[in-house]
Amino acid sequence: MANQLILLKKDFFTDEQQAVTVADRYPQDVFAEHTHEFCELVMVWRGNGLHVLNDRPYRITRGDLFYIRAEDKHSYTSVNDLVLQNIIYCPERLKLNVNWQAMIPGFQGAQWHPHWRLGSMGMNQARQVINQLEHESNGRDPLANEMAELLFGQLVMTLKRHRYATDDLPATSRETLLDKLITALANSLECPFALDAFCQQEQCSERVLRQQFRAQTGMTINQYLRQVRICHAQYLLQHSPLMISEISMQCGFEDSNYFSVVFTRETGMTPSQWRHLSNQSD
């Protein structure tokens, strides 16, 4: 694309030997669609926003993890106190003898699955390593780049150990109620979600859980679920031949008219308009 914004290495790395650095987004503002001369890992710490990656929308919040390749195009919109960190790296500059392809989805042709989640335990461990990595990447001593790369290796191994598919928190997990709730919501795209039943199963207070969720994500539980469903609907409208009424059902709306009302309110256009516009841009 002729007018595509490209983020350049020279604007983020101190020299041509530096392989890894950290870019803080405290908070992440609206950011136009762009690609990069480098790759990045994106860790979301709190708040929420709309992350559009290669034309697929994701409603992101605390614990979301993305593996972004240089050629991927993405943007951030509808942000609300969104706090994240970008760990950016140049694959060709990495010197450490590590099987990076096994650790990083999409690394130099490896199988790519961009979106994962981290629970509280994984987030805490990753944050500690990222803090050290940020310190070293800003260092000026002769071993700073080597130390930063060692820490990057530790980070990608930590992420591989703790990451899980967005709708598949391991049954043996010791993660928090909030992590379990977000996974349960991801499993409720097509069917109603009963918070009271979830709280009864987990033996927790519904009121306290609602407060915790809003404090960490900046949204109510219902708002989050609705927006996740709308993101899924946007994807299906663009990439599937399903009728709008069928997409409505697959996104948890039994009434297609109500689905159209909610979709229009959230996106500013009807499902038909969205599909038409998306097909034109393909």
Curated annotation (Swiss-Prot):
Domain HTH araC/xylS-type stretches = 179-277
Task: List locations, semicolon-separated.
Answer: Cytoplasm
Q: Which UniProt keywords apply?
A: Activator, Cytoplasm, DNA-binding, Repeat, Rhamnose metabolism, Transcription, Transcription regulation
What Pfam families does the record point to? AraC_binding (PF02311), HTH_18 (PF12833)
* SMART domains, sorted: HTH_ARAC
- Residues in the DNA-binding region annotation: 196-217, 244-267
GO BP = positive regulation of DNA-templated transcription; rhamnose metabolic process
Main subcellular localization, coarse class?
A: cytoplasm
Q: Which HAMAP family match?
A: HTH_type_RhaR
Q: Please identify the protein, giving its name as recorded.
A: HTH-type transcriptional activator RhaR
Gene that this sequence comes from? rhaR
